[in-house]
Regions:
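HhH-family (HhH-GPD) DNA N-glycosylase catalytic core used in base-excision repair
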Residues: 1-175
Length: 175
């Protein structure tokens, strides 16, 4: 809502490749999801395809009549989540629920933490690695310097920016 995409396009136009990318995909925006919804949905997305992710999230929302909070899911166990058919991800969801609700993950302070500290905080959850943490930080905590990298992004970076991203993206790498 408060992102000045015009200013970002101006900054990115300093780099020829990024300027072309902005012209090609100028309508893409970063969602501002609820932080728990972002964390749990990116846990569900691990090593998964979009139709299956949609199915798991659909079953979760149907069961709870909407997207549940961590508090709503407080009594869930690996066995009780069997209806999701999420496989190994169920144990990661349960661990996330437990760590968020117990305060072991300082969920309320993540937004104020520096990026590396926030990433490390989320990575205390079983199954949360750098990509899931960065996706959660970008979409759920609006940390625009978080830059989720899957295999495809890594390949593009290796091809186009082998020496690192240009300075015009500093602080907004995730956008």
């Amino acid at each position: 809502l408060n992102t000045d995409y015009g200013e970002l396009k101006r900054r990115f136009s300093e780099n020829e490749t990024l300027s072309k990318a902005c012209s090609f995909a100028g309508g893409i925006r970063i969602l501002r999801q609820d932080s728990w919804e972002a964390l749990s949905s990116f846990i569900i997305s691990q090593n998964n395809n979009i139709p299956r992710i949609k199915g798991i999230i659909g079953r979760l929302c149907e069961h709870y009549s909407g997207y549940p909070s961590a508090e709503d899911m407080a009594d869930e166990t690996i066995d009780s989540l069997a209806y999701l058919r999420s496989g190994f991800r169920a144990k990661y969801l349960v661990d996330a629920i437990e760590k968020v609700l117990s305060g072991e993950i300082d969920y309320q302070k993540i937004k104020e933490m520096p990026l590396d500290d926030a990433r490390n905080e989320l990575m205390k959850i079983k199954g949360v690695g750098p990509k899931v943490a960065d996706c959660t930080l970008l979409f759920g905590f609006y940390k625009t310097d978080a830059f989720p990298k899957d295999v495809w992004v890594k390949r593009v970076l290796a091809q186009w920016y082998p020496n690192g991203l240009p300075s015009c993206v500093k602080g907004v790498e995730g956008i």
